[in-house]
């Protein structure tokens, strides 16, 4: 599984994202330009330049027509993927931590941080997708969800399958389900901070099941990742690691989840790499056991994304590199003991 190593950012990666077909990979970092790459060979298609500082988040719509970025420069920018033009900029009252298109691409969710006297918000903008008038976007949000009084700010968020719900992760370890049309808080659950004694329990990433978005995985500084059902809002599985986790993803085809993390940069020692803190960790989704690790980064993993067809994954690190991995045959053939027994029994019955 020899990866393609992409060197296009001067600073730490903050998010990597595939488009729906998986032929393009989008990346943002703590520098001020986003990059778009061909995922098959690592060739850079182009850059999106216009932000004045760190870009925290990027997303691409289902048609690969538009791309959105949000950053520390208090801006959310909308770009055309085809030619890299910025067609619209929304101003945010505080740094933008996450942007996410709804499954139909008609809405854009934006998390504004709870700093500088601003109360943390999740805003939803209606996106005009008419190619003749892309520069004509609604300036104000159609919905704003504010952090409750004395509540915990949202750090990450995403959409359920049909865009009915917005699921958010908070810095106190809770996950919340909101009505995407009214903004009403429907359910709240403490997903992190209950599996061990860790004090820092902030939710660092949220990614949904690739097949139907009916469940999602969250990673946290509490050294765990948690699988939660969207409808029942109950915890399904817990994956425990030995370092703070910055990112987690669910793989299609195989029942695996991938976790990435490592010590905070300021706490890193020379032994951290040899201890395997900076490896991508693969867990069995059902049995919750770690089944393997992939080395490569020289610092914590900040973001992972799985190719939509399940043939590989990409990781972005504190070291400024993106590594694009293609799974080999041993990955596709791997069976857990229980699965092997089940398969053998089924073969015996035929």
From Swiss-Prot:
UniProt xrefs under SMART domains: WD40
Nuclease keyword on record: no
Any single biological process term in GO: formation of cytoplasmic translation initiation complex
Pfam family, any one: EIF3I
GO CC terms in record: eukaryotic 43S preinitiation complex; eukaryotic 48S preinitiation complex; eukaryotic translation initiation factor 3 complex, eIF3e; eukaryotic translation initiation factor 3 complex, eIF3m; nuclear periphery
Domain of life of the organism encoding this protein: Eukaryota
WD repeats mapped onto the chain: 8-49, 51-89, 91-135, 149-190, 198-240, 296-335
Cellular location(s): Cytoplasm
Keywords, sorted A to Z: Cytoplasm, Initiation factor, Protein biosynthesis, Repeat, WD repeat
Oligomer status and interactors: Component of the eukaryotic translation initiation factor 3 (eIF-3) complex.
Family: Belongs to the eIF-3 subunit I family.
Database matches in PANTHER family: EUKARYOTIC TRANSLATION INITIATION FACTOR 3 SUBUNIT I (PTHR19877:SF1)
Entry protein name: Eukaryotic translation initiation factor 3 subunit I
């Amino acid at each position: 599984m020899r990866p393609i190593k992409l060197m296009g950012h001067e600073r730490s990666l903050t998010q990597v994202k595939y488009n729906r077909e998986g032929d393009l990979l989008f990346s943002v970092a703590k520098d001020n330009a986003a990059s778009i790459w061909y995922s098959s060979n690592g060739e850079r298609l182009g850059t999106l330049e216009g932000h004045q500082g760190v870009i925290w988040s990027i997303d691409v719509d289902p048609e690969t027509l538009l791309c959105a970025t949000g950053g520390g420069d208090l801006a959310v920018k909308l770009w055309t993927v085809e030619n890299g033009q910025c067609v619209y900029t929304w101003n945010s009252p505080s740094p933008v931590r996450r942007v996410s298109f709804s499954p139909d691409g008609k809405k854009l969710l934006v998390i504004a941080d709870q700093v500088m006297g601003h109360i943390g918000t999740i805003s939803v903008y209606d996106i005009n997708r008419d190619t003749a008038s892309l520069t004509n976007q609604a300036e104000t949000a159609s919905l704003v969800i504010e952090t409750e009084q004395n509540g915990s700010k949202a750090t990450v968020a995403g959409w359920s399958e049909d865009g009915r719900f917005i699921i958010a992760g908070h810095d106190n370890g809770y996950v919340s389900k909101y009505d995407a049309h009214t903004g009403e808080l429907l359910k709240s659950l403490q997903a992190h901070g209950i599996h061990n004694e860790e004090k820092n329990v902030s939710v660092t990433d949220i990614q949904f099941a690739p097949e139907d978005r009916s469940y999602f995985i969250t990673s946290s500084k509490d050294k765990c990742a948690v699988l939660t059902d969207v409808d029942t809002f109950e915890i399904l599985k817990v994956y425990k690691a030995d370092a703070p986790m910055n990112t987690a993803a669910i793989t299609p085809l195989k029942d695996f989840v991938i976790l990435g993390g490592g010590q905070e940069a300021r706490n890193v020692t020379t032994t951290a790499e040899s201890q395997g803190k900076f490896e991508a960790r693969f867990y069995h989704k059902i049995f919750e056991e770690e089944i393997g690790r992939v080395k490569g980064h020289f610092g914590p993993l900040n973001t992972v994304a799985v190719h939509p067809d399940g043939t590989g994954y990409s990781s972005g690190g504190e070291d400024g590199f993106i590594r694009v991995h293609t799974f080999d045959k041993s990955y596709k053939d791997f069976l857990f003991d229980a699965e092997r027994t089940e398969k053998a029994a089924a073969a015996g019955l035929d």
